[in-house]
A protein has these predicted regions:
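ABC-family P-loop ATPase nucleotide-binding domain
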Residues: 2-3, 320-373, 619-621
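Helix-to-loop junction immediately C-terminal to a conserved catalytic motif
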Residues: 413
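A short, surface-exposed alpha-helical micro-motif characterized by mixed small hydrophobic
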Residues: 581-583
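Transmembrane alpha-helices and adjacent helix-loop boundaries
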Residues: 1-341
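Catalytic Walker B motif of ABC-type/P-loop ATPase nucleotide-binding domains
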Residues: 539-543
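Conserved ABC transporter NBD signature motif
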Residues: 421-428, 441, 494, 499-500, ...
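The feature captures the beta-strand-to-loop junction immediately N-terminal to the Walker
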Residues: 398-400
Length: 621
């Protein structure tokens, strides 16, 4: 503990020194520019940093292929032109127009997102690209019969930035103002990335289905990403229009979008430091190629091709630079790791044995399926299934491949709505609820094929599961309000406690490792810990011992029993290893073709003629 506090204090000092150095550089940089041309490039670089970070929220954090982003940039610019120029003879102050245009642009982002985010991949890209092209056509053609946009001639003679009646016309002052807002966006991006919102977006990017199964409201989060990116783009558009004192349709065309995407991809999708570096490099480097005309634009493509060949993850990648976790355990941790070959006699066990309650099976139904049927076209995957899982019971489902076991999990967890029948949890009808609502009710699951968030750390994988239990929004996160700080402390406490149940396999230096760096067995353990971190009452484990060797299978078997006996979980298990089923089960249900063949204790079900026939086939006469 003391060592961790010392490390944290050291990191804070490093960050303070780094921030001071960056502040000094930004303060003196305008005076180091050789002429006004390079001062303008320096100022525009700050603007591109804002734009790249705004796109990084949508494409980098949330993984959405948004091709309408440049239109939001334009909406912000033209909003300033409408409200602070002679065009409509309206001259609102900059400090009023800036938040107003950002909010208006965010509204457009929300509207576009609410109508298009049910689409994915290429279809989303096509719709958002169409929006950007329609916006460009409106800019070009809304100059008659009433001149709204100025057409191809744009709108000029915009008001310069003014504060309380004092106009800012100095190029150096403009550079300070734009870089001031760029720094705010950088700092805000860091805070968002490390928060519940950042973890939710990253989970969606990694695996949208798994994210929702861990309690993330994916629709709302994608809308928030769209709106947040549009807000930043709108603010950048306002700053651009006030700096240039004019706006034209070709300021917001498709090549501009390509440049911004290049900045994000060059730096590394999702990596804030990398995106800032990408924006700086691609703002300055092409200026050295300006004399070559058409070849200047080709440089962007060439840079991307070389980067994709040599470093597909971008300059900084996604996690490595920002992750302060150790790559290898130190001597002390190595000792713990070697001493913890028995999964259940970890330091946690030795420290707090007295607080562990013992539970017995209850008679109260926790989960109940009533005549549930699921059809996929002409195929009936589940056929009139009824079952009850009692409080603190382990109920195992067995059956050959294709029997409908995982489909039952998908029905209970809300991935599929049943064709017929009802699902009840603790007496409440949860039929038709979305996965994140099912998680909030108290049901969590693992998957037959591992669905971890591979590029997220072990600790962040578990933290995602607390999403539905927390409420902090962007304002609370950006200003680190007490509610947000309290939720983060509670999230860390809960997730570290659940990971700690697996001892050194998922704790210590492993907290900061990517999930993909774990062994297969530890990935299985992490998926169980992640499900437990949702504060679930019912765990649905889909083949938890799959891929494990005999020793690992024994360990996970004992751990599942411990979840029931020591921690009071109710558990529904799908398992093909019958020795595991026999060891852990209070009751067993056998399925075949979606129908219940037998139900009872292990021996009754294993010796049932129909179950034997389902596994081995019908005996010939």
């Amino acid at each position: 503990m003391e060592r961790d506090l010392m490390r944290e204090e050291g990191r804070r000092k490093e960050k303070a020194v780094l921030c001071l150095a960056i502040g000094i550089i930004l303060a003196i940089a305008p005076f180091l520019m050789p002429n006004n041309y390079w001062l303008r490039i320096y100022t525009m670089t700050g603007l591109f940093v804002m734009l790249a970070l705004g796109l990084n929220v949508v494409a980098g954090f949330a993984g959405l292929l948004d091709l309408s982003y440049v239109a939001f940039f334009g909406i912000g610019g033209y909003t300033y032109a409408f409200l602070s120029s002679d065009h409509f003879n309206i001259h609102l102050p900059f400090l009023l127009v800036l938040p107003l245009s950002a909010l208006i642009t965010m509204g457009f982002g929300f509207a576009l997102g609410s109508t298009s985010l049910r689409l994915k991949g290429d279809y989303l890209a096509i719709v958002t690209l169409a929006f950007a092209q329609i916006f460009k056509l409106l800019l070009l053609n809304l100059d008659r019969p009433i001149n709204i946009t100025g057409g191809v001639n744009g709108i000029y003679n915009l008001d310069p930035i003014n504060f309380f009646g004092l106009s800012i016309e100095s190029p150096i002052a403009y550079s300070y103002i734009i870089w001031f807002f760029a720094v705010i966006v950088v700092l805000g991006s860091f805070r968002i990335k490390k928060s519940r919102l950042g973890r939710g977006w990253e989970a969606i990017r990694e695996d949208e289905l798994a994210a929702e199964a861990m309690g993330v409201n994916t629709t709302r989060m994608k809308l928030l990403a769209f709106a947040g990116g549009a807000f930043i783009a709108g603010a950048a558009g306002t700053l651009f229009a006030s700096f240039q004192e004019s706006v034209f349709p070709n300021n917001f065309d498709f090549p501009q979008l390509v440049i911004i995407y290049c900045m994000v991809i060059l730096g590394g999708l999702g990596n804030i430091v990398g995106v800032v570096l990408g924006a700086i490099v691609l703002s300055i480097l092409p200026e050295f190629l300006r004399e070559y005309g058409a070849y200047r634009m080709m440089s962007y493509g060439l840079i991307l091709i070389v980067l994709m060949a040599l470093r597909p993850q971008g300059i900084m990648g996604e996690i490595g630079f920002l992750t302060k976790g150790k790559k290898r355990p130190d001597k002390e941790e190595t000792g713990v790791l070697k001493a913890s070959t028995d999964l259940y006699y970890t330091e946690t066990d030795k420290m707090e044995p007295q607080i562990r309650p013992r539970f017995r099976r209850g008679d109260r139904p926790v989960l109940e399926l009533r005549n549930v049927t699921m059809n996929f076209g002409g195929l009936r995957a589940v056929d009139g299934l009824s079952l009850i899982v009692h409080e603190r019971e382990i109920l195992s489902m067995i059956g050959p491949n294709g029997a409908g076991k995982t489909t039952v999990f998908n029905l209970v967890s809300g991935i599929y709505p049943p064709t017929a029948g009802r699902v009840f949890f603790e007496g409440v009808d949860i039929t038709g609820l979305r996965p994140h609502q099912v998680v909030k009710a108290g049901i969590a699951r693992t998957f037959q094929n591992l669905r971890l968030f591979g590029n997220m750390t072990v600790l962040d994988n578990a933290r995602v599961s607390q999403f539905c239990q927390t409420r902090s929004g962007p304002i609370s996160i950006l200003f680190h309000l007490p509610r947000y700080q309290k939720e983060e402390i509670e999230t860390d406490t809960i997730t570290k406690e659940k990971l700690g149940l697996f001892g050194a396999r998922l704790t210590g230096y492993r907290f900061d490792q990517k999930a993909t760096s774990l062994s297969y067995a530890n990935r299985r353990r992490l998926e169980i810990a992640r499900a437990m971190s949702t504060n679930a009452k019912l765990l649905m484990l889909d083949e938890p011992s799959a891929g494990m060797n005999p020793q690992e299978t024994i360990e996970i078997t004992e751990f599942i029993k411990k979840l029931r006996d020591v921690y009071g979980y109710t558990i529904l298990v799908i398992e093909h290893k019958l020795n595991v089923v026999k060891t852990i089960s209070d009751r067993v249900i056998a399925l075949d073709y979606g129908r219940k063949l037998a139900e009872g204790n292990y021996d009754e079900v294993a010796n049932h003629p129909q179950v034997i026939e389902a596994y081995l086939g019908r005996k010939k006469n």
